[in-house]
Amino acid sequence: MNNSDFDNVQLFRRIIDQGFCQGDLSIADEICAAKLSEHEYLAKTDAPGPEILKDQIRDARSSIRDLVLTVEDIVESGDTVWARSRATGSDPRSGKPVSIYVIDICRFDNGKLVEHWGVPDRFALLHQIGALPPKPPLGH
């Protein structure tokens, strides 16, 4: 099989839907390569590929209660999928609703995720849960 035999957009959507939204960690064993190059800031990178993705799923689901990720834009170019998604739910400590954007770039090889860059808007998350001071009024 070669890369043209796989629907990389569908593989990405399965990671989002089954993994992040439903909490099904087995998706990582199915779709991740044993060696995953992870470039997301603060991500654990010293584990086998599936364990890296499982850690990210657990972290996201513990950081945002009732997590729903909605893919709003998605583009495929060759072996790479680029997506902008909205993550919604609530802060588990305060119960405050949260809504942030996440940018993902995933490279696949023969149906396996081999490289990932992730940019969740952590600044927006911290602001929404009150961990950062409120924005000052205009003109000050």
Which residues does each PLM region occupy?
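Conserved hydrophobic/aromatic beta-strand scaffold that supports enzyme active sites
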Residues: 82-84, 103-105
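Low-complexity, intrinsically disordered terminal/linker segments enriched in charged
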Residues: 115-140
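Short, acidic, Ser/Thr-enriched surface-loop or helix-capping motifs
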Residues: 92, 108
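A solvent-exposed, acidic/Ser-Thr-rich amphipathic alpha-helical stretch
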Residues: 25-81
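Short, surface-exposed coil-to-beta transition loops
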Residues: 68-69, 98-103
